[in-house]
């Protein structure tokens, strides 16, 4: 995947809320900095200490749970397909996760840069994205995420 060279906001948090169904505390994309509908997206997730998961994961050494990193990547993947013309209306949900690996801890104060690229879309109902999340240029998580349309 190519590195984004822009820090301009392409989609604000308000615009993202108009495209994705997720709401607090599960809205995990703060802004989109690059977006090619139907092809790829790059977004930012600012990790802050006042997020609810850090009360229990772990109070003495807060770490962002891996499942939330994967969910943030999936939400960025969802932004790719929400802007595609000719897709049926409905909700895209997880259908599978392949090859996900965690390479470094993500902690409060980090900024996740999440890049997703659409690998395939079959029958306008089943899709696969390649996703990676980095912090300060270091790979934190990567994998392939599958989704399907729920009528």
Curated annotation (Swiss-Prot):
Pfam families: FabA (PF07977). InterPro entries: FabA_FabZ, FabZ, HotDog_dom_sf. It catalyses: a (3R)-hydroxyacyl-[ACP] = a (2E)-enoyl-[ACP] + H2O. GO terms for cellular component: cytoplasm; membrane. Its EC number is 4.2.1.59. It is found in: Cytoplasm. The active site is at residue 57. It comes from the Bacteria. It is an enzyme of class 4 (lyase). One of its GO terms (biological process) is lipid A biosynthetic process. CDD domains: FabZ. One of its GO terms (molecular function) is (3R)-hydroxyacyl-[acyl-carrier-protein] dehydratase activity. Keywords: Cytoplasm, Lipid A biosynthesis, Lipid biosynthesis, Lipid metabolism, Lyase. HAMAP family: FabZ. Belongs to the thioester dehydratase family. FabZ subfamily. Involved in unsaturated fatty acids biosynthesis. Catalyzes the dehydration of short chain beta-hydroxyacyl-ACPs and long chain saturated and unsaturated beta-hydroxyacyl-ACPs. This is 3-hydroxyacyl-[acyl-carrier-protein] dehydratase FabZ. The gene is fabZ.
């Amino acid at each position: 995947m190519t590195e984004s060279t822009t820090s301009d906001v392409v989609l604000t948090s308000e615009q993202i809320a108009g495209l994705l169904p997720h709401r607090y505390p599960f809205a995990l994309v703060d802004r989109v900095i690059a977006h090619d509908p139907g092809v790829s997206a790059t977004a930012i997730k600012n990790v802050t200490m006042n997020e609810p998961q850090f009360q229990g994961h772990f109070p003495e050494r807060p770490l962002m749970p891996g499942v939330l990193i994967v969910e943030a990547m999936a939400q960025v993947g969802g932004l790719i397909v929400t802007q595609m013309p000719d897709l049926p209306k409905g909700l895209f949900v997880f259908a599978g996760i392949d090859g996900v690996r965690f390479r470094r801890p993500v902690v409060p104060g980090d900024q996740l840069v999440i890049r997703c690229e659409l690998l395939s879309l079959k029958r306008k109902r089943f899709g696969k994205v390649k996703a990676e999340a980095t912090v300060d240029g270091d790979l934190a998580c990567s994998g392939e995420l599958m989704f399907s349309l729920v009528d």
